[in-house]
């Protein structure tokens, strides 16, 4: 009878330990919510000059229509045309 009680106490203790560690991990993940003003250092910073260059010289087609007039330079090097602007994708 004592061994059964001891096994039950140990099982409850292990369950409590696992539950506590899982709750702490979940709480830590909730604390790391990204706010709109936060910047993510893992994301590459966008070069302002490259954006302006691509805005004025984008010639990638979107839905069959060019973003910028023909004869202009195309956005290259991973830049794509979105909403009539060249963006780094």
Curated annotation (Swiss-Prot):
A cellular-component GO term for this protein: extracellular region
Paired cysteines (S-S): 54-75, 58-81, 67-86
Xref: SUPFAM superfamilies: omega toxin-like
Cleaved propeptide residues: 24-50
Keywords, sorted A to Z: Calcium channel impairing toxin, Disulfide bond, Ion channel impairing toxin, Neurotoxin, Secreted, Signal, Toxin, Voltage-gated calcium channel impairing toxin
Locations listed in the record: Secreted
One of the Pfam families matching this protein, by short name: Toxin_20
GO molecular function: calcium channel regulator activity; toxin activity
Tissue expression as described in the entry: Expressed by the venom gland.
Stretches that traverse the bilayer: none
Signal peptide (UniProt feature, chain positions): 1-23
Protein family membership: Belongs to the neurotoxin 12 (Hwtx-2) family. 06 (TXP1) subfamily.
Function: Inhibits voltage-gated calcium channels (Cav) in rat cerebellar granule cells. Has insecticidal activity.
Protein name (database record): Omega-theraphotoxin-Ba1c
């Amino acid at each position: 009878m004592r061994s059964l009680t001891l096994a039950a106490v140990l099982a409850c203790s292990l369950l409590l330990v696992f539950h506590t560690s899982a709750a702490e991990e979940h709480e830590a993940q909730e604390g790391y919510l990204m706010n709109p003003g936060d910047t993510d250092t893992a994301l590459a910073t966008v070069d302002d000059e490259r954006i302006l260059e691509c805005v004025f010289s984008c010639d990638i087609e979107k839905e069959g229509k060019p973003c910028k007039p023909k004869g202009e330079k195309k956005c290259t090097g991973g830049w794509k045309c979105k909403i009539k602007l060249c963006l780094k994708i």
